[in-house]
Amino acid sequence: MTYPLDRLPQAGGLTPPQLFADGADLPTISKLAEDPMIDGFTTNPTLLAKAGVSDYEAFARSALEVVGDRPISFEVFADEPAEIVRQARLLAGWGDAVFVKVPVTTTDGTSTHDVVAELAADGVQLNVTALMTPRQVAVVSAALAGGPPSYISVFAGRVADAGRDPLPIMAASVAIMAAEADQRLIWASPREAYNYVQAAQVGCQVITMTADLLAKLPTIGKDLD
């Protein structure tokens, strides 16, 4: 489900993106799982550490129990290709709703293209993350082609933090992925509620938001007079 945009003149007739909740606090995930507006969930190692998660699998299995059949992303901790593959297969085995997050590069900047292609060919549902450019999107989309349903997460907020307009990058990413029906683009690392509107404007299918940003969405279209 989505929040309507018809109260905004600049967004009339646009299709709102699906909403994913971003976080690793289990009570918050449980609460948001009761909200019909939430279409899926994402987590990452930074959020896990912030939430004090010490047993990754126990946390993940508890989260899977409350989110039902909605997609939820769990990220690998590994930074070496063979270990990324091993961890990804392990995480994928935790449930049918699991999408395994794999960063687009390792910490030394090496592309994970081959890892992504191998996992996709093996039927692992992936959420390739931390992308910043349309070139990266094109490479990842090609690696995922022919595999199971997948997501590509572009860090639009970090693009904006670098002083660049994320809209052309997101629009180009949408165009690159248009031919791949099983691939969906995620507007990741949003900084404000207005990013929800911007995602709709460029045709981005999904936006993932932390609980504090999700709480602001009902004010979209509010009369400012």
List the predicted regions and their residue ranges.
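Active-site beta->alpha loop and helix N-cap motifs at the rims of alpha/beta catalytic domains
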Residues: 2-8, 13-30, 34-38, 42-118, ...
